Amino acid sequence: MEGTEARQRRLEGCGRLKELGPLPSHDAGRLPKASEEGHLAVSESQLVDAKSLEAPPGRETSLIIGFQVVIPFLLAGVGLSWAGLLLNYFQHWPVFKDVKDLMTLVPPLVGLKGNLEMTLASRLSTSANTGQIDDRQERYKIISSNLAVVQVQATVVGLLAAVASLMLGTVSHEEFDWSKVALLCTSSVITAFLAALALGILMICIVIGARKFGVNPDNIATPIAASLGDLITLSILALMSSFFYSHKDTWYLTPLVCVGFLALTPLWLFIAKQNPPIMKILKYGWFPIILAMIISSFGGLILSKTISKHEFKGMAVLTPVMCGVGGNLVAIQTSRISTFLHMWSTPGVLPVQMKRFWPNPCFIFCSSEINSVSARVLLFLVVPGHLIFFYLICLVEGQSVTNSKIFILLYLVAGVVQVVILLYLAEVTVRLTWHQALDPDNHCIPYLTGLGDLLGTSLLALCFFLDWLLRGRANLQELVSELVSVPP
């Protein structure tokens, strides 16, 4: 099977080949045959002992995982809270008021940043944990090719995100202004390009630093990226779009800049070709990112339709937090499961305890298996995390969001429901992609973060709507009781 030799080298680098025994040999491009039940037909020599899936003494426990995750998670939440405050501020800028599709563009563009950086962080974390970046020459090769691939993806999908936002916005617009189309496309491409470059360099520094200090990069890389990612992306988008809006009379400026950034694509392709395994991402990795962008665009449509309505006051502030927390936690879990499979199995071969594609939710959240332990830790962070971030937002911008007890309860329930769904789907999608000999780092995280954006935006809008209904009903009952108590 393609990739078996590479995986064997990774296992040898980790010193775990003895524990696993010899790796199975398959013909190139062929997978193990599936059983009649749809599960893998795995020989006894290929099965991983069930005990190895449990957290052994001296390895990662819930306390260790929680200790490594909680600080980056809180930092990420602070960054997401500030991103929400910025979005609430930017929505009043002239360019956001005049170019309505800019607000529709926010979730897919922020989600694109998240998809690219989280998949990059996950790939680099897997490379670090399997010892591939310990060699200086190999490290340079992996880093440069990964950065180049991210730049190509950011440029192309940034343009597609603008097109998707325009298509969704066309339904509600009567006229089609080409100057606004050029502004939206150029702002999207530049934002995606610069944000991907800045965050990619940050990810590289974090993963290499974590490796040197003996910290698992899977636990800290994606949260730290999220702590600055939304801030950087929103700031660049607002500044670039405002700049081009102020120079809208110079008709050739936006097309010229957009073409200039697109013209850099061959350079990134040349750099990426230096590492053939990474180059495969450009051949087969487009569909997950584009589909995730489309899913996020529907979340952006919900945001643009609700953000200016009185009953949804606070939607702009809380959307980055709700979407970001869910996407953050599921990216951590996906990266951990992916690393686990890279270290303990080979592509196409699932460990015996993971052979079911649709596992029992109780196994996902209540077993002693190491991935179940991490799922519980991440789930336990949701409620206290959201309370802290909500409190910070109320301190800074209390008048922009309702703080009724009913809404807070609905908000917390929505956050838990979102993360439970995403963590379960993380386990399912990783198993399915690994069964197909695909890398979960590249194929699962985009789907899950895109779905997290749509779920987060939808559930948050539902919270505001239910709170408005319940408060309206309570006010109506209070008014009726006052009228009844008034003497004739």
From Swiss-Prot:
Ranges that cross the membrane: 63-83, 147-167, 189-209, 220-240, 251-271, 284-304, 377-397, 406-426, 450-470
Major subcellular site: mitochondrion
Region (Disordered): 1-36
Compartments in which it is found: Mitochondrion inner membrane
Gene Ontology cellular-component annotations: mitochondrial inner membrane
InterPro entries given in the database record: SLC41_membr_dom, SLC41_membr_dom_sf, SLC41A1-3
Catalytic reaction list: Mg(2+)(in) + 2 Na(+)(out) = Mg(2+)(out) + 2 Na(+)(in)
BP GO annotations: mitochondrial magnesium ion transmembrane transport
Superkingdom in the source lineage: Eukaryota
Function, in words: Na(+)/Mg(2+) ion exchanger that acts as a predominant Mg(2+) efflux system at the mitochondrial inner membrane.
Similarity remark: Belongs to the SLC41A transporter family.
Protein name per the record: Solute carrier family 41 member 3
Lineage: Eukaryota, Metazoa, Chordata, Craniata, Vertebrata
